[in-house]
């Protein structure tokens, strides 16, 4: 698996060292073991996990800036993209948030096993923890989950003014077009769209770079359940 992972990293032009490689493969080992008794991901084959979780998450690596010091991954699941990015960026602090206890228990295990001092795991919801963390983060992360107009309402309030949100999406959806109202209300705008291909399957991936231009009204995010039922 090591050679396969190295080849993938080289194809997507992400640099690595032996420490990052060792921790990533340990993460893979823990995930495979945990997933055998607790369903964290439907992808179960080693090479598929490396490409569709690890390398897919690391498509963000070259979009991160030196000045990006605090990042939040909302709905992180089994830790993608936040945990693998934390392994590759020990100088940056990552908050991994998920409301499902079995997932955050797993993430705590990974954090402790890999001695990742730059990772904070929180079991909870964005609407519950925003009070103490409003406009505290440089970068917001989220892979796939929810419609863009919904996840914008969760993510943008956490970002500092001039902070960026880097959602990962599938190419060919109407989500961008349908998110114009949410972007306006939350004082944010799309800077750029990046199209990538996964290194082995050649599957298309999209990363959207969104800038927070001004403070967000403190009534956002709305109470639990409302963003999903009544998107902006």
From Swiss-Prot:
The gene is rsmG. One of its GO terms (cellular component) is cytosol. The keyword rRNA processing applies. It comes from Fusobacterium nucleatum subsp. nucleatum (strain ATCC 25586 / DSM 15643 / BCRC 10681 / CIP 101130 / JCM 8532 / KCTC 2640 / LMG 13131 / VPI 4355). Its EC number is 2.1.1.-. InterPro entries: rRNA_ssu_MeTfrase_G, SAM-dependent_MTases_sf. This is Ribosomal RNA small subunit methyltransferase G. It is found in: Cytoplasm. Its main location: cytoplasm. One of its GO terms (molecular function) is rRNA (guanine-N7-)-methyltransferase activity. S-adenosyl-L-methionine binds at residues 75, 80, 126-127, 143. HAMAP family: 16SrRNA_methyltr_G (MF_00074).
């Amino acid at each position: 698996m090591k050679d396969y992972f190295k080849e993938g990293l080289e194809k997507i032009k992400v640099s690595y060292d032996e420490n990052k490689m060792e921790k990533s493969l340990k993460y893979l080992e823990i995930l495979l073991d945990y997933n055998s008794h607790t369903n964290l991901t439907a992808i179960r084959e080693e090479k598929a996990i490396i490409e569709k979780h690890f390398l897919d998450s690391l498509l963000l690596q070259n979009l991160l800036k030196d000045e990006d010091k605090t990042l939040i991954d909302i709905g992180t699941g089994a830790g993608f993209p936040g945990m693998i990015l934390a392994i590759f960026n020990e100088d940056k602090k990552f908050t991994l948030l998920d409301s499902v206890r079995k997932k955050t228990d797993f993430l705590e295990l990974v954090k402790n096993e890999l001695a990742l001092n730059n990772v904070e795991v929180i079991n909870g919801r964005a609407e519950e923890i925003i009070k103490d963390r409003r406009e505290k983060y440089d970068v917001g992360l989220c892979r796939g989950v929810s419609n863009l107009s919904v996840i914008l309402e969760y993510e943008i309030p956490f970002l500092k003014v001039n902070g960026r949100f880097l959602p990962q999406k599938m190419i060919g959806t109407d989500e961008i077009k349908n998110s114009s109202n949410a972007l306006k209300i939350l004082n944010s705008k799309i800077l750029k769209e990046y199209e990538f291909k996964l290194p082995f399957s050649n599957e298309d991936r999209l990363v959207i770079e969104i800038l927070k231009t001004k403070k967000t009204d403190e009534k956002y995010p709305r109470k639990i359940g409302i963003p999903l039922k009544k998107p902006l």
